[in-house]
Swiss-Prot record:
Alphabetical keyword list: Ribonucleoprotein, Ribosomal protein
Xref: InterPro entries: Ribosomal_uL13, Ribosomal_uL13_bac-type, Ribosomal_uL13_CS, Ribosomal_uL13_sf
Family matches, as PROSITE patterns: RIBOSOMAL_L13
Family to which this protein belongs: Belongs to the universal ribosomal protein uL13 family.
Quaternary data: Part of the 50S ribosomal subunit.
Organism encoding this protein: Rickettsia bellii (strain OSU 85-389)
Record GO biological process: negative regulation of translation; translation
Protein name from the UniProt record: Large ribosomal subunit protein uL13
SUPFAM superfamilies: Ribosomal protein L13
Entry function: This protein is one of the early assembly proteins of the 50S ribosomal subunit, although it is not seen to bind rRNA by itself. It is important during the early stages of 50S assembly.
Molecular-function GO term, any one: structural constituent of ribosome
GO cellular component, one term: cytosolic large ribosomal subunit
Amino acid sequence: MKTYSAKPSEIEKKWWVIDAKNVVLGRLASRVANMLRGKHKPSFTPHMDCGDNIIIINAEHVTLTGKKANPKDGKIYYRHTGFPGGIKDTTAGKILSGKHPERVIKMAVKRMITRNALGAKQMSNLYIYANSEHPHAGQQPVVYDFASQNPKNKK
């Protein structure tokens, strides 16, 4: 028996919509990363973009467990300006209460995807919105009820 390798014409992409209201961030991000890669499909091929398109709504209501949500000493995200001494930091709580709360989910998923050109292509199939409205109704996305799959998914 030969190893199956999907061809680009055989790949079928579905559209999913996931409600992130009161859902634990890390659990959501790991499931979304697997769906973006296509690992939930029997036709998974590691070198092809065989994952689905995912829409996440209500990103501002995602939950962080433990002390990570504390704005003062919670989970810290670092970045560097490129200049000497230019390291900047912010917390997950500040980002969630700021202008772009969807960035917390995007960063969590991005760090679970491979860091190469294929990973960038897979990340382009992720659409995150802070509130419950999205402009992708024409694609007829299927609702994926992530919160009810495991009691630990919802907080």
